[in-house]
Structure formats: structure tokens, C-alpha cells
Amino acid sequence: MDNTNRLRHLRSRKQSKFTLGDTAEVNSVKWEFINMTEQEEDLIFRMHRLVGDRWDLIAGRVVGREAKDIERYWIMRNCDHCSHKRRRVHKFYRFSISPP
């Protein structure tokens, strides 16, 4: 019986160590707003309407983009928490492009 308790204790220590490492990795990622062209945005919105959150399938249609980039773009584009980054990026591009 003593041996089974020791195995349970070891297993629970490994599990807790594993989960702590995962959260530290996720929290350390710095997200910056991803700039997409109008064609890429349009394609992402249309594909999302058709297939939903299947980011790997959508990334196969958008040339040069990975599934994680498209998912991050979608989250940042549609969440209220990231709206201040959107405004700052669009404001920068609006004033940096001169009219024809």
C-alpha cells in the first residue's frame, strides 16, 4: 500500500510540473496586431463563415500565413480587449499613406 501512495504522489508532482510549464509559456507570448491585406481579410471572413474555427484549413487558402497567425488575427480582430491595438495600428497606417 505504501508503494501505491508513493506512485500517486510522483504522478501528481509530474502533472503539476507539466501544467505550470504550459501556463508560463502561454503567458510569455507577446501578441502584436497582425496586418492583413483587404483580400486576406475578406478571404478569412468568408472562409470562417463556411468552415468555422478550422484555422489550418483557412491557412491553406491564405498564401504565406500559418494557422496560428490567422487564429491570432481573428481573436485580436474580434475581441474588445484588443481594440486599443487595432485603433493604434489603423491610425498609423491611415496617416502614413499619402493620397494619390
Swiss-Prot record:
GO terms for biological process: negative regulation of DNA-templated transcription; negative regulation of trichome patterning; trichome patterning. It is found in: Nucleus. Keywords: Developmental protein, DNA-binding, Nucleus, Repressor, Transcription, Transcription regulation. GO terms for molecular function: DNA binding. InterPro entries: Homeodomain-like_sf, Myb_TF_plants, SANT/Myb. Expressed in cotyledons, petioles, rosette leaves, hydathodes, cauline leaves, stems, pedicels and flower buds. SUPFAM superfamilies: Homeodomain-like (SSF46689). One of its GO terms (cellular component) is nucleus. The keyword Repeat does not apply. Residues 37-74 form the Myb-like domain. CDD domains: SANT. Interacts with GL3. MYB-type transcription factor involved in trichome cell specification. Acts as a negative regulator of trichome patterning and formation. May function by suppressing the expression of GL3. Plants over-expressing TCL2 does not have any trichomes on rosette leaves, inflorescence stems, cauline leaves or floral organs. This is MYB-like transcription factor TCL2. The gene is TCL2.
